[in-house]
A protein has these predicted regions:
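Conserved hydrophobic register position within alpha-solenoid helical repeats
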Residues: 55-56, 103
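Electron-transfer interface patches adjacent to heme c in soluble/periplasmic c-type cytochromes
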Residues: 59-63, 94-97
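Buried hydrophobic core positions in alpha-solenoid tandem helical repeats
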Residues: 40, 67-75
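Long, helix-rich interaction regions
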Residues: 28, 32-36, 45, 79-180
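Residue-level signature of the C-terminal ends
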Residues: 62-63, 74, 110-114
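Residue-level detector of extended alpha-helical repeat arrays and alpha-solenoid scaffolds
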Residues: 50-53, 68, 96, 100
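Bacterial N-terminal signal peptides that target proteins for export
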Residues: 2-13
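C-terminal motif of bacterial Sec signal peptides marking the signal peptidase cleavage site
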Residues: 23-24
Length: 180
């Protein structure tokens, strides 16, 4: 009797282990065609995002406007990340890659319908060139995050013929920032 119970317990433990193995493998898989923001952010932070593309030039996941609110949730995290899915030429100007700034770039790319710029770096509007000295400070990036949040919140309310707001669809309007 005891060996029969022990055998059944062993069978159940085996089934549970197999099920746990398969479910844990699928949770961390990132699908570029149907991306999940949480998985994207976690893999960027851990450096485990598999960049897809040819010749080491990555391409962006197919995020949509439905993802903007979730992307904004993580945008104030200025953790340094090792890589971001853009062509390597984008990093030639140097400077650290900050998660939040790259997520804002992703949002801007969704807004425009194409890549916002050559890289996920913002510079001052009056920058003479794209050297690192013109990149935004952490405080300025956080200001840009708030501007994007205000823009997104404002987009929830319909624009009418009486709306007089030149910055209605320009998150960085009125700031001294632009995409590199």
């Amino acid at each position: 009797m005891n060996s029969r119970i022990f055998s059944q317990i062993k069978s159940w433990i085996y089934i549970i282990c197999i099920a746990a193995t398969f479910s844990s493998c699928t949770q961390g898989v990132f699908d570029y065609e149907h991306p999940d923001v949480e998985i994207f952010v976690n893999q960027l932070k851990s450096g485990k995002l598999a960049i897809q593309g040819t010749d080491q030039a990555g391409y962006m996941p197919k995020f949509t406007t439905d993802d903007i609110e979730t992307l904004l949730k993580y945008a104030d995290d200025l953790s340094e990340i090792p890589a971001f899915p853009l062509a390597p030429v984008s990093y030639s100007a140097g400077g650290k890659l900050r998660l939040g700034e790259c997520l804002l770039w992703t949002i801007e790319s969704i807004r425009l319908g194409h890549n916002a710029s050559m890289g996920c770096k913002m510079v001052h509007v009056d920058a003479e060139d794209y050297e690192g000295i013109y990149f935004l400070s952490d405080e300025e990036v956080l200001d840009a995050v708030q501007r994007y949040r205000n823009w997104w919140e404002g987009r929830k309310y319909p624009r009418t013929m009486w709306t007089i707001d030149p910055c209605f669809d320009e998150p960085l309007c009125g700031s001294n920032y632009m995409w590199w």
